[in-house]
């Protein structure tokens, strides 16, 4: 179980994606918490004892973006060093340079590969970055 005892917080507005993420991660030993829209992310994070990794959708409903949420999370002392990975259908050639500049720990293109997803997050948890654009890796 490559994610045993790891707590992963996911911000994702699509229920089907949340279920796919959750199933893949729980199967590998992680505990998973969710925020659907992004607007209550800081509230939820402040009420958790710890989070080992945060997964952010970049294109959320109601005008909130993962880029905005990233900056808000980095403003919390408790979470300013927690790795944050973007998971998005956004064009990687546009997203990745911006994510790297902003300080994200990785990008995983949607649709995710549910077999690779836990391994990719484990890689980030080990201190490396992951820039996955589907069939190839940047």
Regions found by a protein language model. Give the residues of each.
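Alpha4 helix (beta4-alpha4-beta5 surface) of REC/receiver domains from two-component response regulators
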Residues: 67-68, 90-108, 119
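Short amphipathic alpha-helix used as the core "switch/output" element in two-component signaling
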Residues: 65-80
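Acidic, metal-coordinating helix/loop segments flanking the phosphotransfer/catalytic sites
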Residues: 34-53, 61
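C-terminal output helix
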Residues: 112-121, 129, 133
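His-Asp phosphorelay/catalytic-motif detector in bacterial-type signaling
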Residues: 50-52, 77-83
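Conserved acidic carboxylate
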Residues: 12
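Two-component/phosphorelay signaling modules centered on CheY-like receiver
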Residues: 15-33
